[in-house]
Regions:
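Conserved catalytic or metal-liganding residues and their short signature motifs at active sites
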Residues: 1-170
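C-terminal soluble interaction/assembly domains
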Residues: 168-189
Length: 189
């Protein structure tokens, strides 16, 4: 009956593929309109600012509508944002979109940098921005922290920033406790 109705109304050439939520007791006519207008179910995934690549993979792995396995990508290679995802889309495809968004945005921001910048590459800028972001949870403090770190780097000093120690210990996952004295002495890469 559905095929006949779609064919008779000419909607067979206008149907749009996708995932739909059809209300219970929907009429045949309203279902056809839904499919022709393409009012598909939309799913979103948010990668918050400041989250590590390992945490991003955790988010992707919790999304049951996605398929496939992914390795944890390089730190700083994913752009934090809200992404629209589709049922049966691969996790690798979502990671690739996050990486393309990072490349586009980093290129745009790199072009706007100060000529006096202490960082010499977009990758260094991303690393420094990540450290600044982890050093303070307050956006209003970030310019001061960034200036202090830039001055230290300009003078050849160490950053001596807790987030660099935590990252060396956890590889991007939360530490969940204070830093131990022994960890302050240990070399981390």
């Amino acid at each position: 009956m559905f095929k006949a109705a779609v064919s008779l109304t000419g909607a067979d050439r206008k149907l749009r593929a996708g995932e739909y939520e059809v209300p219970s007791r929907a009429s045949l006519r309203s279902v056809i309109i839904l499919l022709v207008e393409g009012r598909v179910v939309r799913h979103y995934l948010t990668l918050p600012e400041g989250w590590s690549s390992a945490q991003a993979v955790d988010i992707l792995n919790r999304e049951t509508i996605l398929t496939g396995e992914v390795e944890v990508p390089a730190e700083g290679s994913l752009w934090p944002d809200t992404y629209e995802i589709s049922r049966d889309e691969t996790r690798a495809a979502v990671i690739a979109r996050m990486q393309r968004a990072r490349d586009r945005n980093l290129a745009r921001l790199w072009a706007l940098r100060s000529p006096n910048s202490v960082v010499t590459s977009p990758e260094e800028a991303m690393i420094l921005a990540s450290i600044v972001e982890k050093e303070t949870g307050l956006a209003s403090e970030r310019p001061r922290v960034a200036a202090a770190f830039s001055n230290r780097l300009r003078l050849g000093m160490r950053l001596e920033s807790d987030p660099t120690i935590v990252y060396g210990i956890t590889k991007g996952r939360p530490l969940g406790r204070g830093i131990r004295q022994s960890e302050l002495q240990r070399q981390t890469a």
